[in-house]
């Protein structure tokens, strides 16, 4: 094997390992970490709508959301997956299990509401 071929194979192997490692790291996020990564900036750490974007979009409170209050899991799942208005959809970023964990977490936050 020529040195050039060996170098190209080594670069390809390293690139592949980096790519796989980046995907694996995301998959190991706990549910609160998923929420912090994808949701908290707008919805706040506890779902209270006090995130960084509150001034731009004041209706971000998950705790008083009609969908959450009536227990509509399908609607919450759809909003997370497809987005709505200024909220982006996360279908390409979350696998089905992560999506379901975020739906569960949304309702958990509402139950913990003071």
Question: What kind of region is each of these model predictions?
Answer:
Residues 25-27, 48, 108-114:
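Inter-heme linker and motif-flanking segments adjacent to c-type heme-binding CXXCH motifs
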Residues 32, 47-77:
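Gly/Gly-Pro-rich "capping" loops immediately C-terminal to redox-active cysteine motifs
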Residues 35-45, 87, 102, 106:
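The canonical Cys-X-X-Cys-His
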């Amino acid at each position: 094997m020529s040195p050039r071929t060996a170098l190209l194979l080594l670069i390809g192997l390293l690139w592949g390992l980096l790519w796989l490692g980046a995907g694996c790291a995301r998959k190991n996020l706990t549910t609160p970490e998923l929420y912090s990564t994808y949701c908290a900036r707008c919805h706040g750490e506890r779902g209270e709508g006090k995130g960084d974007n509150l001034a731009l979009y004041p209706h971000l409170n998950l705790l008083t959301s009609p969908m959450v209050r009536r227990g509509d899991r399908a609607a919450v799942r759809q909003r997370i997956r497809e987005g709505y208005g200024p909220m982006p959809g996360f279908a390409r970023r979350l696998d089905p299990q992560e999506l379901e964990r975020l739906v569960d977490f949304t309702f958990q936050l509402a139950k913990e509401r003071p």
